[in-house]
Amino acid sequence: MRFWGIFIFVLLILNRGIAQTPEVLHTFWQQKEMKHAAIGVSVKNVADGKVVYEYNAGMSLRPASVLKLLSTSLALKLKGDSLTFHTKVFYSGKIRDGLLQGNIVIEPGGDPCLDSKYFKGNFLSRLVDSIVRLGIKQIEGNIIIENEGQQPLIPGSWLWEDVANYYAALYHPFNYRDNTYTINLASGKPGTSTRVVSVIPSVPGVKLRNEVVSSVKQQDDAWIYGGPEASTLSMRGTIPANRSSFAVKGAMHHPASVFRAELEKELKNKGVVLKKEKDILTDRQEFFTVESPLLKEIVFYTNKNSVNLFAEALGALVSPSEFETMVKEELNHVGIDSSGITIKDACGLSTSNALPAGTVTDLLVWANKHLGDSFLASLPQGGVDRGLRVYSADSVLGANLKAKTGSMFGVRALSGYLHTRKGETLAFTIFVNSYTGDPVKVQETIRDFLRELAIQ
């Protein structure tokens, strides 16, 4: 009799634990900050792909920058981790007595990393040195950058307030300095106008209308407005008061023209005169080539630093014109349901993107087995990378968390891997859309949910 009593007691405890697990986890999505939100959650064990927890896992929601997990993983799948881009430079005509009777011609290879702050390349200075070593003192023709007129289209679902700011830099055949320029502003007392100290690099043909004022707020709340063909860009908003120099970054919509101006300036400093008398279309000789970092290195910064430009480059690598179609085909090819996907860009900036949490988690389970460190190393690390500081503040999480964040107005998203106390590795995706509470509280709720997962 005593045996049966103990048996029934143990059975009740086990059943109680099993029944409570989803109920306990569900309570996180019933808190005040989540009351009006649309929430999708998917958690699976990477070892066998079995479901650990689901909550609206099939609901299509805005992923923000979590979309980069698709761009990076599929680029690695299709192109391998060692692919590189090549930029070639030629001179046309003949060099006689220091005079180049022709042009300098740059053949872009789609490299998104030329003189990027994320890599040490020195493309501009190395090209200038190569021209000088040829003994050129004068260039009769021009500097020609091929495909310069191929202006990329802005996705129609990008917000107007984003388009002129650095994180909306478009991917071009020729890219330079992350297609970003920096406006340094000086501020005075709160409420007073600011002034432009410098623009680096200078942007030919574009004027700035500065309407930014000084503020007691200690944050960057200044925005740039204007499309790619605008001759005048407006700057509005506020920056902290009493700053001698405060940086506001904009999207460089015509990187080829900016680079040409920089190259001409540097050549002049070296005593090389660009005469621009005529374009001489003759045979050309390659004299300088730049190879980009490996694809896995570009993927690393795409996810670690959430670089939209790099993500758009990877999207073009996957498919120059049909990224969404290719994503669906590749996911279906590896057995992942793609029916709930809507994709309007490759970086996650579009407010029209929609993904089911379950689809992204399935991709993570697949990537863990097939892509290895080239993909896994690109994910932000808890306790190390600044983007995860809220999520990994808990000691239970910390280094046990590797995940990509996503955020835009009304959206908080997180997707990656979690190592549990049991020694298991879980792949998870959490999308929270249209919340009305404090975004930090939303992130803290996600953190507490992950903590509960980790200790069960």
Region locations from a protein language model:
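Bacterial Sec-dependent N-terminal signal peptides
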Residues: M1-V24
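Beta-lactamase-like hydrolase cores
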Residues: I18-S60, D81, H86, G121, ...
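Conserved serine DD-peptidase/penicillin-binding transpeptidase domain
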Residues: F28, L78-S338, I455-Q456
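Short, ordered coil/turn segments that flank beta-strands lining enzyme active or ligand-binding pockets
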Residues: A47, K189, R421
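Residue-level preference for non-acidic, small/hydrophobic
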Residues: G49, V66-A75, I143, F174, ...
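Small-residue-rich helix-loop
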Residues: V52-E54, V272, V290, N305, ...
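Short active-site loop at a secondary-structure junction
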Residues: E54-L70, L74, L78, V299
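A generic structural motif
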Residues: M59, G110-P112, S434-T436
